[in-house]
């Protein structure tokens, strides 16, 4: 097995942040002690140079993290059907179903989007993020449905990654949340960082968190719930889930950030990535792609419209 390589681009708002602190926020599956060892061993470079843990970012650097590969099962192509929205020589956009993990990780080495892409695209996937994440430039949570883009070559990958870094990509999500809204629209501007009590969770962190902005618009109000559209200005891990919970509107079905009771039996959060738009890396044209609400989501909305209030 080869080493796992991950590439990150520091954002302007990261200026002045120590590299070890930055990485502890970005690498959710890597402990602080391992980050320190990676730095000490020269496995983390900033613009091609090894740095110490006290290095402070300028906010524009390319950061490469090389993690020596643990003994894990070989990642193999799998003939898993994909709901392809669009495909060309540079990108492929798919409508990801609920329950499917985007890339292999501990406990999920088969049945992922990556396994399916490796079969469908063969060797035509970008290699920037290493053997565990070929083609993957962004991701959505396992129980979030909807549109994601994968890249077939490194040029396209770098281009899309740069657009993500400057927040120029259009990303609209749809979700059902607890409680009715009084306002028709609004913005949550609250920094997000790792939950100090559980690194697998995120939390609003006004002292050490990274800038996170979510714009929301109420589409329908029901008795105890609301159907809303959320547009991401930034793209932090679990951003919509954390932001909605922070203002008293946790997402229905979210078993991590929602503590409100519901009679609906759901597999995770009722959250759908409905719209993704970006400048095409080869043509320079803006393209926008949509994924329809999944069947379970439509049935839930129908029940709420008929007066359901579980």
Stretches with model-predicted labels:
Residues 130-162, 170, 174, 189-247, ...:
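The conserved catalytic core of RNA pseudouridine synthases
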Residues 45, 85-86, 206, 265, ...:
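A general beta-strand register signal
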Residues 84, 177, 215-218, 251:
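Conserved hydrophobic positions within beta-strands
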Residues 52-56, 229, 268:
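Short, surface-exposed secondary-structure edge patches
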Residues 1-187, 191, 295-304:
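RNA pseudouridine synthases
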Residues 47-53, 224-227, 262:
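Short alpha-helix capping/helix-loop boundary micro-motifs
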Residues 48, 67, 242, 260-261:
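Conserved "cap/hinge" positions at secondary-structure junctions
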Residues 203, 253-265:
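Short, surface-exposed loop/helix-turn segments at secondary-structure junctions
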